[in-house]
Amino acid sequence: MDREDNLPVQPDKPPKSLVRPILNLETTSSSSSSSSSSPELLRHLQAAFKRHRPLSKMQTTSIGPRRSVAPQRQASRNTRLVTAEGQRSQDVVTLSQSLAANTLTQDTTNNLAITSVAGESASITQPTVSEHFNPSDRQMDFGKSAVTSLESNLDVQRKSQSLIGTSQDMEWDATNQAEASHLDACIGSKHQNLPSVDSEVSLKSEYKDSSSLAKIQGQLGEFPNFLNQPRTRCSAVGSSWATTTLIHSSSAPMLNATTHVSRSYVEADSNANPHAVQSQGNLPSCCPSSKVSNILHPNKDATASEMPASTNDPEVRVKETDTSKQQQITTGLEAPVGSSIYGSDGQANARLPEELHTSVSSQPQKSDKHEKVASSKGPSAPRKRNYDPDLFFKVNGKLYQRLGKIGSGGSSEVHKVISSDCTIYALKKIKLKGRDYATAYGFCQEIGYLKKLKGKTNIIQLIDYEVTDKTLLQEVLNGTMSNKDGRVKEDGFIYMVLEYGEIDLAHMLSQKWREIEGSDRTIDENWLRFYWQQILQAVNTIHEERIVHSDLKPANFLLVRGFLKLIDFGIAKAINSDTTNIQRDSQVGTLSYMSPEAFMCNESDENGNTIKCGRPSDIWSLGCILYQMVYGRTPFADYKTFWAKFKVITDPNHEITYNQLSNPWLIDLMKKCLAWDRNQRWRIPELLQHPFLAPPIPHEPQVKTIKLFSLIAESCGSDDDKANSMISQLEQLLSNPAPLPRNDVLDSRDQNQQLLSRVSELCIQLQDRLQGLEGEN
């Protein structure tokens, strides 16, 4: 263009103290007045800047940055700008460029440059900081007083509202706090001839202005001193869109900490009064007609607690009201504006943080999606778990944290858990799906037995339980379950919270025999007697309750706080009141501990009676446990296969091998438990009175007699067979005299006299023997 040839020579590099030109709003002259400005006026302006400059991080009571929303009635005037107005704006740009060059050499020490441009055309000044435009800028409110004053000056209103909505042109107004406060003072007085500190930046993104603005970019350069003051950048697009940018003093010279918040005004009323925006980075609520869809915090370190308490909504949202407008603004801001205004000057471009470059059009889609998800949740939606099932079990509303798995088998698991009161328990989890109803019935029946045995010290205690299949549990407890042939099809679990035991009897025996192995030692009888008595007492407890366990083995006796307790009633059976035995439908138990009648259940014996299982079956299992405690193996451990075990156990002529022991009562006790005929087996009350547990106490006279004979035997010597024979005869006559042959002539008194005579003869003979030994010596 012709006007561009008359531009002054651009300096190589503008000084760092260069600031943007300040436009005098009340000047009506068409020529430049910057060169004729008096030094006194310059000092007044510097003093005004220092007076109204707020501290960057202190709370002040001074007037903050405010933005005046243009009345709706001015929109039609702004949209009817003609080509001549654009030409005059370009002239002003050229003139402003010339004045900026003159100002560079005028005063470098004051760090302030003033340029006054007069004319009817709108003034355009290059922005002080180069940055990538973001449509999410902060909106500012200038207040009611500023709106009233600005409306009185139509010329200023026309300059501040140079909007071209149909051609995607945008005008950006940048004002700092000092300029805003000074502008209110100047316009409020109206009659004072002080220069206004307000500056207007009108940037046109397309058409002829884009080339002129790109050239001004290189001339103005960086303004670090000017950036030390907080300032705002405002823009208005059309009649319903407005954006503002707050530039903190701490962000100079780059805009790394700037705040960009975009708002959409939906058909704003001409009398709308937007709320003031706080200058400390807090986001106020939007005007009543605005909706929320996007949030951008002013600072990375800002938190929700920093939001003002007066806000109605802690988040600033954007509602997508017009799709075509949104697409037009997004395109105009991201591509044409960014490229035409900032050009290719790398020094003037300030990169914003990547998290602040959020597309306006993408955020409403996320909020809409969130609303759809929220609306899809109805009363029928499953309730989300408030705990991690991999770390916790929930039984009847109580949480138990997993500590480790104790054991598992089939579809059952036993876990070590801890409750909320820091108590350790064992949690048994049984999966019901796929199991036959008979087994499921037995597991549910175990709960009933444990509830019945609650409070028994030698029976494991049930703390809590839950059966997910409530119908199955109710049928079992009521005894009305009829379908026992099929399998459970629904997903169901049984949770049982039990006492936690340190170790079971099987592991105790394994450790005990590992210590004895390789030595000549045998099992400690006191240790054996102590735990055998506890085993008998535990089984006696369930027998008194008419319950047959049917699966007694070392693993089902658990050591809890030093005492053995009976566990696992999964296949236990209750004995009817009118019988002493029970009849089973199938063989149950562990092979090495099963009784002969358990193998031959439902068969007939030699008398034609049906073989049933009962209390004697548990006695056989107890005999196998005692045999393992004494010898370290079961009675039929040498038979490996099922059929080999079945053959020897069901054979009444098979004799169990008992190795020689120091205590013959222990062998006798095992024989009383392992009698093949179930009617010959001792009952538990009798076993508790067996001499192994209750050895007989000898009478005092007998002890003295034995001691006397031992002294006589020592005096006679071990080589004197005749004397030892007489001593043995005397012991037998005194301890257990054999009855004499029956004689009808002699009565009992005569027989007793004969026994005494016999004792006397032996004593006389023994006395003579002792005297003969003394004569020989």
Swiss-Prot record:
* Comp. bias (Low complexity): 29-38
Q: Which residues form the Protein kinase domain?
A: 400-693
**GO biological process: one example:** protein autophosphorylation
**Catalyzed reactions per annotation:** L-threonyl-[protein] + ATP = O-phospho-L-threonyl-[protein] + ADP + H(+); L-seryl-[protein] + ATP = O-phospho-L-seryl-[protein] + ADP + H(+); L-tyrosyl-[protein] + ATP = O-phospho-L-tyrosyl-[protein] + ADP + H(+)
**InterPro entries in the cross-refs:** Kinase-like_dom_sf, Mps1_cat, Prot_kinase_dom, Protein_kinase_ATP_BS, Ser/Thr_kinase_AS
Q: Where is the composition biased (Polar residues)?
A: 274-293
Q: Which domain of life is it from?
A: Eukaryota
Residue ranges, annotated region (Disordered)? 1-41, 57-79, 274-387
Q: Give its E.C. classification number.
A: 2.7.12.2
- What is the enzyme's main class? transferase
- Residues of the active site are D551 (proton acceptor)
Which keywords belong to this entry?
A: ATP-binding, Kinase, Nucleotide-binding, Serine/threonine-protein kinase, Transferase
**Which residue stretches does the UniProt record annotate as biased composition, category Basic and acidic residues?**
314-323
Q: Name one GO molecular function term.
A: protein serine/threonine kinase activity
- Summarize where ATP binds, as residue positions: I406, G407, S408, G409, G410, S411, S412, E413, V414, K428
Summarizing the function annotation, the protein's role is:
Involved in the regulation of the onset of mitosis. Involved in a pathway that coordinates cell proliferation and differentiation. Implicated in spindle pole body (SPD) duplication. May be a downstream regulator of auxin signaling in the formation of secondary roots.
Query: Belongs to which family?
Result: Belongs to the protein kinase superfamily. Ser/Thr protein kinase family.
The name this protein carries in UniProt is: Serine/threonine-protein kinase MPS1
Gene, per the UniProt record: MPS1
